[in-house]
């Protein structure tokens, strides 16, 4: 009987291990399915040309600008160039002088340039603003919330937004002066 009882005990242990392992596997599969379904929700939308640009509000760094925050919805009725950049990004540095050169002219035409800094600290951004004599709004996305909202990958990335809030164009990489001017013309409010 000892042999029979030993066999029965081994079978019970095997069955218990099988049930335990199956339960763990089922829990893991359920967790993976939940994670996939959660990531498919609308808050993970990738914005494309023709979509409405999502609203945001960020603290303003540039002292040249009157307001202390920049909120996209406050610029309704104007064309908006929304540029995502960082001080360590060489292509970003290359296009900043073009943006500054065109800012005053296009501000009069109803186009606002907003350069969202993705740097970690305000100090480096403030020094950059002084070095390049930037006079357009430079809000700071310290925590990356707006970067995540717009799904920004490579820098610079620029959204050109029509006066009605619709995305006209998305450009990844540095802009030349000619391309920049062309896009700014495309989003300028129509003069009647």
Curated annotation (Swiss-Prot):
InterPro entries: AhpC/TSA, Thiol-dS_OxRdtase_ResA, Thioredoxin-like_sf, Thioredoxin_domain, Thioredoxin_ResA/DsbE_sf. It is a single-pass type II membrane protein. The chain crosses the membrane at residues 22-41. CDD domains: TlpA_like_family. GO terms for molecular function: antioxidant activity; disulfide oxidoreductase activity. Pathway: Protein modification; cytochrome c assembly. Thiol-disulfide oxidoreductase which is required in disulfide reduction during c-type cytochrome synthesis. May accept reducing equivalents from CcdA, leading to breakage of disulfide bonds in apocytochrome c; following this reduction heme can be covalently attached. This is Thiol-disulfide oxidoreductase ResA.
